Amino acid sequence: MCSSDLKVNSHAQVSEASPHRLVQMLMEGGLDRMAQAKGALSRGDIAQKGLMLGKAIEIISGLRDGLEPEKAEDPAAIQRLDALYNYMGNRLVEANRVNDVEMIDEVSRLLITVKTGWDAIAPQ
């Protein structure tokens, strides 16, 4: 499958996905970008590491921007999630600055925890 076929397939998945699935896809993308950044860092490819962490930060910012506290049953929980996403983005900025794999791992673990909870509330 060539690159253009993958893009078409990705666009089809996004256009057909439920809002819940779109959030899952963003989280999966964030985790993938962080894994790619770690791989680039281990190879000494600092430019690629920066690019992948930048994309992970954009994804986390997108998740944060998608929060709707006014529609939540528990607005305080949304505020805590907002603060967590903010923390995650800041940690990735710092991880990028100092080339720290442990910081990337920390954010990956946090995002996995959030994703596990999100996956558990999937609509039936």
How should these model regions be labeled?
Residues 92-108:
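Amphipathic, charged alpha-helical scaffolds that flank and support histidine-based chemistry
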Residues 32-52:
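Short, well-structured hydrophobic secondary-structure segments
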Residues 62-78:
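Short, solvent-exposed, charged loop/turn and helix-capping segments
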Residues 30, 74-85:
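Short, well-ordered alpha-helical segments
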Residues 54-57, 61, 86, 112, ...:
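Generic structural signal for well-ordered, non-transmembrane alpha-helical segments
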Residues 49, 56, 104-107:
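Solenoid-repeat scaffolds in large eukaryotic assemblies
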